[in-house]
From Swiss-Prot:
Residues 783-792, 945-954 have a biased composition (Basic residues). Polycomb group (PcG) protein. While PcG proteins are generally required to maintain the transcriptionally repressive state of homeotic genes throughout development, this protein is specifically required during the first 6 hours of embryogenesis to establish the repressed state. Component of the Esc/E(z) complex, which methylates 'Lys-9' and 'Lys-27' residues of histone H3, leading to transcriptional repression of the affected target gene. This is Polycomb protein Pcl. SUPFAM superfamilies: FYVE/PHD zinc finger. Belongs to the Polycomblike family. A zinc finger (PHD-type) spans 424-472, 512-560. It is found in: Nucleus; Chromosome.
């Protein structure tokens, strides 16, 4: 097992870094080049430690800068050179193995058995350097690598000479040691992270240094690391020792002019127990390239790849401290106890009430909450779900600044300097905290809003709550987007226009606040853009703009009253035919939701309808239609970059569409706030053609009669209209009906009063005196509202014929019923107020002749219904009996066991005649008339000419009729009372009653249950039965004709 540990001692603040992992005394070279670092060879007399590396932090040198002062790592208890007490020692200890003498000898002479340590700095920026710009870039050189074998017995002077002569690779200083001996003030460098990568190299033993440099080397993979932290002071160039170094450095690109801190955070990656073996394929950046293609020199780390990886990382103090450090894996050999960590005093972080903070919970995540209460050592946090929790300050983190979390583990700890919170509250809408702006604080949640960023704030309203807290569980009320013209001249917008978040083309902002009114809108629909402030304004809110524009018609030069000293500047630009077609296709696409439009069916009618409103010259408006059509066709062909012909997409060539679905391009006219607008400026500077101003008389006549725009209707993108399609016609119909009713009332007053119909009942039967009911003329496509209105109109007209005046005894005067208030009851029920009045059309001759001797009043009406027809010689009509219900007798089973219905033939000539009380027959005009009834009756059979009587075949009778004939007797042809006038026989009476009420045998055939309760015989021999029909207590006496 491998054990990696390090020691950190605090007797003296370390100032320098070196890598002497091989002990070899050397003499300093007085005339050494500028300060560098290098490897020191191991003495030949000592037994080398197998795979052991020591990393030291050296103090500043004492004496001249040219004198090299070195410290050596201890590999045994006896050493001749002192070891500085302030060291960080990283030891890679593998299990000691007993090797044979031959292997031991080979190990001692192998130059690459010892580990090479490379320091790779991933810090993307250096915060401050007290160096001029020309020296700053030369101080930190690109990443370089240099590997030096342990064998060969080279001295320090030889190594320095080797590095200076360029035999090996030119070495660069480590990131902590700048290459200079300048006596300028010490430079300050802040490094976020340093990865120490341990590479093990295994090659055969070369005999000389030159041969070892040309041998291909195979680096081992980087050992998985556990991060530990240590605070190291920065190193000044004036205290650097002179030696050779094989470390790497990263040049920094960010500089600032002030010094911030004197400590750097160094993160040492320590391997864990899952260490890979040397035989594992290499995963280091230098192993990406193939060993066979590598140069004889040792593999290098590319500067570009490393810098790219450095820039892709986001080293920050918060990210490092957010994750707790993982403790190191317990080693197999017990490591020495680590020294107590050095912790800088963390600055005090204060939190205020109603401040939003992050709280770190047990799951490792941060949750947003608001401080609502505090004690001496705890804070009460309320979360968004209304839950509350007491937290200590070390678990809190400021929303916009640093953190007070102190993390420690593995013998190291870090603290981060926090930024102080802003002095005043911040608006949650615009995320700004300006001193001159007033931020209103919600009383419940503590969130702040500028008065211009929300519409709920009312000045002087006292306690205020935001919309989120005022109605947390209710749906938002629909905001009224009705555009109303503001009163007076607007000199100041009710919102902060500079805080709006606009898109790239400055057409739409995220807040949806526009115009003088601060309400939303659509830039391509009745809105114009100011040429100075570039804000968009509704045409309805402008002072003298009365027109409605087409979608995408923004060819105006407009300046608002805020930018133009209270006067609006509006000028219309003249457009070309290509813009006319673009506007036409853009509107058709918005309204019809189609991409392609036919030239003759869609585009041509639209331009003919709208060409008097489009900004084209008067000559083009008066073009003949043939010339206009030719101009449109030629324009569509010439501008193929804006219009698409249907031929390109396998459509008819008469179809066209926009290549890009946006509105037409408008000339950009933007001016500075101090520039003065004029027509000359627009024509000379921007080369615009302006339309002449329209006279005011046309604007005054416009509201009188505005032609209906057939293309002006709502689309899915437009706001919904509150009025439905049926309400407008209903209102028009109601107004028209009121006018007609008033006219009829005036005519009715001019006509002479008619006598009361109740006093003259002789005229009741006259059809000329009765108003015939007028059927309503209902259209199939009319709505229910129209039907209801017409029916109510009929009711109002018919109610005028009745006497609706109420007396003192009526229910409406007592107020006992609301229905009586709506429909007042009449005074009497005579004449037309009779509820049983039936307006029947009758012939005048019959009415005059029969009405003599009839009673007056209700009796006369009943007699008029059931009176005899003296001259009637008609034959009785054949009426089919009513449909009967299906009974069990009608169901049969076929030969194949299928269920069938029994078919019974019903003869239309089978008429049931029963004897009952003598009443007048019902008039024939109340009975249904069929086509077969209109046929003339068959002529009576006369005597044949051949003198022989033909034998008449008996007619087939129905089962019900045969059953009736077998149980009953036949009736006489005339009544017993002697009233046998022609046409008034009992047969006609019984036939009419049977046709109207239905016969007993029909009811029996229909399956209606019945029971015979009694039987009697009359004096004339007629037998009558008392029949009780199923379920009814009432009985009916039915006379059956017997023999």
């Amino acid at each position: 097992m491998m054990n990696n540990h390090f020691h950190l001692q605090h007797d003296h603040p370390p100032q320098n870094v070196a890598h002497p992992f091989m002990q070899q005394p050397s003499t300093a070279v007085p005339s050494a080049p500028p300060a560098t670092y290098g490897y020191l060879a191991q003495p030949a007399g000592q037994q080398p430690q197998w795979m052991t590396t020591t990393y030291q932090i050296l103090p500043p040198s004492v004496g001249p800068a040219t004198v090299a002062k070195r410290y050596y790592a201890t590999t045994g208890p006896q050493t001749t050179h002192p070891t500085h007490p302030s060291t960080i020692q990283i030891t890679n200890s593998f299990a000691q193995q007993s090797t044979p003498p031959k292997q031991q000898a080979a190990t001692s002479c192998s130059p690459f058995k010892a580990n090479n340590i490379r320091i790779i700095s991933t810090a993307p920026s250096v915060y401050s350097l007290n160096k001029p710009p020309q020296e700053a870039h030369s101080t930190y050189a690109p990443v370089q690598s240099y590997y030096l074998p342990s064998g060969g017995g080279q001295t320090a002077g030889q190594i320095n000479l080797l590095a200076a002569s360029g035999t090996g690779k030119q070495l660069q200083p480590p990131p902590l040691v700048p290459v200079t001996n300048s006596t300028s003030p010490p430079s300050t460098v802040v490094l976020d992270r340093i990865n120490i990568c341990i590479n093990n190299h295994y090659t055969e033993t070369p005999t000389s240094l030159s041969s070892s440099l040309t041998t291909a080397q195979q680096p081992s993979p980087i050992i998985p690391a556990i991060q530990h932290k240590a605070i190291l002071p920065l190193i000044d160039s004036s205290t650097a020792d002179s030696s050779s170094c094989s470390s790497s450095s990263v040049s920094s690109s960010s500089y600032s002019g002030t010094a911030t801190t004197s400590a750097a955070v160094v993160i040492v990656d320590e391997p864990d127990s899952t260490t890979t073996t040397p035989q594992t394929p290499p995963t280091t950046p230098e192993a990406m390239s193939s060993p066979g293609k590598s140069s004889p020199s040792p593999p290098l780390l590319a500067t570009q790849s490393l810098l790219k990886g450095v820039n892709s990382m986001k080293p920050s103090f918060k990210t490092v401290e957010a994750a707790p450090p993982t403790p190191p894996t317990p080693p197999s050999p017990p490591p020495p106890p680590p020294a107590p960590p050095v912790a800088a005093p963390s600055p005090a972080v204060t939190y205020a009430l109603q401040e939003d903070v992050f709280i770190k919970c047990n799951d490792g995540r941060f949750y947003l909450g608001t401080i609502i209460d505090q004690t001496s050592d705890q804070y009460l946090i309320r979360f968004d779900d209304q839950s509350e929790q007491w937290c200590e300050p070390d678990k809190l983190r400021k929303l916009g600044g640093g953190s007070s979390i102190t993390a420690g583990g593995g013998g190291a700890s870090t603290t981060e300097s926090t930024n102080t919170s802003p002095s005043g509250p911040m608006c949650v809408a615009c995320k700004r905290s300006d001193i001159e702006d007033v931020v209103e604080i919600c009383e419940r949640c503590g969130r702040g809003y500028h008065r211009g960023c929300t519409v709920e704030i009312v000045t002087g309203s006292g306690i205020w709550s935001c919309k989120r807290c005022a109605k947390p569980m209710k749906m938002q009320q629909p905001v009224s987007h009705k555009i109303t013209k503001p009163a007076g001249i607007c000199r100041q917008l009710p919102y902060h226009a500079d805080k709006l978040s606009w898109d790239e083309k400055h057409r739409v902002n995220e807040e949806q606040i526009y115009c003088y009114c601060g309400k939303p809108g659509k830039f391509d629909h009745n809105m114009l853009q100011c040429c100075k402030c570039r804000n968009w304004f509704h045409t309805q809110c402008m002072q003298n703009f009365k027109k409605k524009l087409l979608r995408g018609d923004m060819f105006f030069v407009f300046c608002c009253t805020v930018c133009n000293n209270g006067i609006e500047f509006v000028r219309r630009m003249q457009i070309e035919w290509v813009d006319v077609l673009h506007i036409a296709l853009y509107n058709l696409r918005k309204h019809q939701h189609q991409k392609y439009h036919h030239l003759l069916n869609d585009i041509w009618p639209f331009i003919l309808e709208q060409r008097h409103q489009l900004p084209i010259c008067e000559k083009w408006r008066t073009l003949p239609e043939t010339a206009l059509m030719e101009r449109l066709k030629q324009t569509l062909k010439d501008y193929s970059d804006r219009f698409v012909c249907g031929r390109e997409f396998k459509r008819a060539p008469a179809f066209y569409a926009l290549r890009h679905s946006g509105p037409p391009h408008i000339p950009k006219v933007f001016l500075e706030p101090h520039e003065e607008l004029s027509d000359e400026l627009l024509e000379k500077r921007f080369k615009l053609m302006l339309m002449p101003e329209e006279p005011d008389e046309g604007a005054n006549e416009l509201p009188k009669r505005v032609p209906k725009d057939v293309y002006e209707f709502n689309t899915d993108e437009d706001d919904p209209v509150e009025t439905s399609e049926d309400e407008i016609p209903i209102k028009q119909i109601i107004e028209k009906a009121k006018k007609q009713a008033a006219q009829k009332a005036d005519k009715h007053d001019e006509l002479p009063l008619k006598p009361d119909l109740a006093d003259d009942n002789a005229n009741d039967g006259d059809p000329g005196k009765l108003p015939a009911p007028i059927p309503p003329l209902l259209d199939a496509n009319s709505s229910r509202k129209r039907k209801a209105f017409r029916l109510s109109k009929r009711y109002d007209n018919s109610r005028n014929h009745c006497d609706l005046s109420s007396d003192e005894n009526s229910s409406s005067s007592r107020g006992t019923s609301s229905l009586d208030l709506i429909i007042p009851p009449p005074v009497n029920f005579l004449g037309r107020n009779n509820p049983f009045l039936m307006a029947t059309p009758k012939k005048a001759s019959q009415g005059r002749s029969i009405s003599v001797g009839t009673g007056v009043g209700v009796n006369g009406i009943i007699n008029s219904i059931f009176k005899l027809k003296g001259t009637s010689k008609e034959q009785p009509r054949m009426v089919r009996t009513i449909k009967r219900r299906l009974s069990a007798k009608d169901i049969t089973i076929g030969p194949n066991q299928e269920v069938r219905r029994r078919r019974t033939r019903r003869l239309t000539t089978a008429i049931e005649v029963i004897s009952t009380t003598t009443i007048n027959p019902i008039p024939s005009h109340y009975l249904p008339i069929y086509a077969k009834d209109l046929q003339p009756p068959a002529p009576p059979m006369g005597k044949p000419t051949h003198g022989r009587l033909l034998r008449q075949r008996p007619q087939k009778q129905s089962p019900s009729q045969s059953r009736r004939n077998s149980t009953s007797s036949t009736a006489t042809s005339s009544s017993s009372n002697g009233i046998g006038a022609p046409g008034h026989s009992m047969l006609d009476l019984k036939q009419s009653v049977n046709k109207y009420f239905g016969g007993a045998m029909n009811r029996i055939d229909a399956g209606e249950p019945f029971a015979i309760r009694a039987k009697r015989r009359m004096g004339n021999g007629q037998v009558q039965y008392l029949v009780e029909w199923g379920g009814d207590t009432a009985t009916t006496a039915i006379g059956l004709l017997g023999n």
